[in-house]
Amino acid sequence: MKFHLTPLQIEKRATIQRLTAQENRVDIPSRFKITKEQLASLEGEICGKVVWPWSPGYDADKKSFNDVFPANPFVIVYAACYQDIRICLEFAKVNQLQIALRSGAHSFADYSVCDGMVIDVSSLKSIYVDPANYTVWVEAGTSFADLNPALEFYGMHLPGGGCPTVCVAGYMQGGGYGLTSRNFGIHSDCVQEFTMMLADGRLVVANPDQNTDLFWAVRGGTGGNFGVLLSVKYKIFPLGLIWGLQITWDFENDPTNAAKALYAIQENYLTGYKHPKLGIETLLFTDIATDNHRKVLFGAGFIGTEAELNSVIAALMAIPGATIRLKKQGKYSDVNNWVLEGIPDVPPDVKFYGRSTYISKSLSIADYVAILNFFKTAPNSYSMVDMEGYGGEINRYPENRSSFIHRKATMDFFCLLFFDKASNDQEKNRLWMIQFFNFMSRYSNGHSYQNYPNRDQVGFQWAYWGPYYKQLVVTKNKYNPDNVFAYQQAIGGSLEPDQEKEQIMLFDNKPVVYESY
């Protein structure tokens, strides 16, 4: 019977023939004790695309969003179904391969790639919207570029990230801050249930009533710790058009007015439950596109009328030097791009270092002047600081209800330092980042946002999870006892003795509830 093969099936046949032919010249690195027959078997069993070091496009496939810490995977598997993931886990176990899990490849510290096996779930991106029950079910590889329009068709919304190519798997497991989080909560707060495949291939469903410790841990405990996230069910919210806003203050020659603006933003919006319908990201950047001056940019998304917006921002507009750069109404996905895209205006193919710290106390105008002056010493004009505004629904969510514990902060203060071959200052950027955050320690509450990991972060266990870290270790040992998913900042390291004393345990050790399929 005549039948047609897909292009991928044709490619797979050619790969298997190459691996099994007597004259094949595939070189397997000596550190891997794997036969060519095993590779051919894996290629044949996997439904999705398998990329080997000799495959066309390998160099592009192995790269992450940032690629500061490049890896050379032995194999990359684009899972086309859940069985592909199960096969990969067994293959990695038998052949003692390190595993990295990847969805959107947006890990700041490149933790979604390794020199062993990369399991990529970006092809798993089904979406089912149930507007009548205010829920959406998505697979782990779904990007916000796909999810936002699917929700907007029904006039619905889920808080999401600033970059549309981010996928829900990594984003949700680190918490997930977005422009509407002050009104609707952190992304992981909206999770009602998820399905995960554990390292032994078994499936678990976690929600407030089943596997409750895992439900708590995954929502903030970061990816690559407990298992492979397969799908998530979220609560969603009605949302129509919103306003996008940008106001700038120049501090190239005098930081006074810009510092007053930062202080006003803090006092008027970020302390207490003030104006939650105003989402805030305040940036320090160099305006390369216009006058090359350093500026403060108040970026915002507002849910309400123009008159209400004008009333809310009146205090900011009264500060000398305030310049409206954008004021426009549109869909959330458009506003999100308008407010954040292109700041700073960096060339293509740049790399970056990123790091964050949380601020809980009110800073003075003099404090902000000092921060602005330090920012002026950044290595190049691509550098930026983003002060993500907290408060509102973010801080109303109980601290112990998920492992995203940062509920007392006024802002997440994070820095991105970009560099490329032309700037030729990678190490200078890395060292300046350390100096900057040593300076910022006087203002910090000692914690950092786990979705912005930095490999130079000392004491990340306390910085990301504070007094709940030990509960995360216990939960990981329960669901991933062999520590199959491991990387530099994976859960499992020890705390300082004084931090150990402050640890809070939340759950009894109930048995794992497995699914029957």
Predicted regions and their residues:
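Soluble FAD-dependent oxygen oxidases
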Residues: M1-Y517
